[in-house]
Amino acid sequence: MNKTFVWEYRKSLLERWINEYATVLRPKLVKERCTLKGNWQEKHFDKHTTVWGGEPAADLLTNHLRPEKFLIYTKKNRIELIKTYNLMPDKNGETEILEMFWKEIKGKTAPPLLVYADLILEGGKRNKEAAEKIYHEYIQPNL
């Protein structure tokens, strides 16, 4: 007999994951804050160690959101990151640096699910609109 299992309540599971990410995992990933020197679009990250998250990733995925705050996920150490990408440590800077915690890297951005979560957690009308676009284009088809 072939049994097929169906996941019910996938949207609520997604919401629960975002809440757990915000309260359990994300606080452990924070490295520091910086000021980004120069145009963010001219930063050429080594895609195996550093990618965009949050607003810049949303802009790259949707071409809809012009970033005001920046989020970088990286496996690089602090000194290497600052030197390589011309960042200035600044506890009030607009750029947050988080530890990259996944292995598979495709492209210039964090996985769409993570970008969506970052936008939802950051809040605001602009981020909500971009999050909805990402949800409908990248997440909902896979739920």
Annotate the PLM regions.
Residues N2-E8, K47-W52, E104-A110:
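Short, exposed beta-strand "edge-strand" segments with a Pro/Gly-rich flavor and a Y/T-containing core
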Residues E80-L143:
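Hydrophobic alpha-helical interaction segments
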Residues V24-L98:
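Short gly/ser-rich loop at a beta-strand->alpha-helix junction or flexible surface loop bordering the NTP-binding
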Residues N2-T23:
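Short, cationic-aromatic polyanion-contact patches
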